């Protein structure tokens, strides 16, 4: 039976239709927020997937171009692969949902959010997030919901709940928070150096709004929810763990994992696995899950070491950062490069500068964003973790890590007017043992400074982890988690920022939420750590941006012209501007406001191009001096081209102070001559004189 539910949310109406569409899905809802419409569905397989030791959850966020009245580009005129925004939104939805499914659930689950219309006042990402949580909670799929999500913007210091697309894009804060009834379960933020106290305030304002959404969901689930279905547990049998502990004691496992060298630890675990496989040779059902069982045994051992003994696997103190190193100019000839090393995590970042014509073009649902000037890309090759694998391009993880490090630096980048370049930073993972995205932030910051990009402040990033006990008060926050602590811990809380404030946050967890004291402690720990990284490591490699771009980087000169004269510079079908480019070997960009950027590597050629543009756009007042080329000779005079596409005439009587009978007696085609402007005639044509040029010219 079709039912409709509504609530007021941040000054707009949120409407949920249940039973109207997609009856064959486990859960479905057509959701409208303002006039933004998203179809959210969830489907689970009947049986668990064989041979997997993880929960196979897939989250999709489909951006349909008809939602904004567009026909997709390309030959087929249909949507292709997911955009970067769609991938990032899918990841943000996945992170709070995944911890709320049973840990021993192995059925395939697909969450799909299809954007069908977009109201610029109501962002579709918010609707998809709410829809995913709602349809899963009301479905028959095992899920410990509900959870809810809210976005927060900030303009002039004032918070704005679920801001419009325009406010979200231009404001000082882009914060997304997911909550359960009592705890925060996910945080994603980009910020313009916001102080830690202000960020915490914003997080818990979102949390409060989430409680009203959860109450709304409770009403819907009470009327339309389905009983949860039974499922086959894939948990490791208790008797198997007992048998393992007789062969490999907890002390043996602790000794195996207690080393600061990742490769040694992995070798120790392989030996333990081989020993257990030999002992369980006659138990096929145990051999099938032995890898997962050893993983769980490691996990219990590491968590006990940290929580009860305050002993980390590599011997560090709870708040201690791994050994750090930083250097710049590692790679010759590139525009800027830097390498940042933290323990066994190592990132090399390379920056490339280009004219603004090379900005990334974006054709998405947000009409306010059509280009991206700063691009950060992250690569994670198999060799960085000692594996063999063919590279098949960036996956969702690589795109997500690249976007986080990009978000971290956006707040400190110079404006286009201050620095008229497109900027690409590429982080190459040389070695990985946790927090490569935070190392990418540090490396890209240094590479930008080495490239001569005048960033406003230095930015660093660090991640905190968490191990929890049986109660909310029983926990330990870890500074700078390595890979093992990430895998076996409960939290990965990444924060980037300057000395002034936070520029980005990404928090994802494996438990059912964090209390406020944990959130506050994690943010305080990351602040202390990033100050140390900037002051004691990064600033000793490079303390401020270089005053000029590198020798191999293109140079850019900017001038302003009258917008009404842009057509004169461009010429008919681009003839004039193309001739300037051909003569001087430069690139020229002109905005609608008349800002002209000339880009090249030869300063003399660039100056020549600037002179041509200035000449073309001059008002040709009487007395101006020009140098030009004779391009045509007539009986009555000669035509002088003084700039591409610009000609004036010297009458025969104005060629020489002495009387001449023929123009050819003095001038030939191709001659370079200096002329003085006499003004324009009634037809608007420019008149020149050679004989009246002042002697000092």
Regions of interest found by a model, annotated:
Residues 1-45, 49, 53, 230-369, ...:
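Extended amphipathic alpha-helical scaffolds
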Residues 1-232:
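Long, basic N-terminal domains or extensions that often function
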Residues 25-109, 115-117, 122, 188, ...:
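Glycine-rich, flexible beta-strand/loop modules in the N-terminal catalytic cores of phosphate-handling
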Residues 27-29, 122-141, 328-351, 433-453, ...:
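Conserved phosphate/anionic-ligand binding catalytic regions in large, soluble enzymes, centered on
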Residues 33, 42-44, 61-63, 113-117, ...:
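Flexible glycine-/small-residue-rich
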Residues 103-109, 144-146, 213-231, 263, ...:
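Flexible, glycine/charged-enriched surface loops at secondary-structure junctions
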Residues 140-260, 448-547:
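Mobile "lid/hinge" segments at catalytic clefts and subdomain interfaces of large enzymes
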Residues 290, 552-556, 563-697:
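Single-stranded RNA-binding regions, centering on S1/OB-family and related RNA-binding modules
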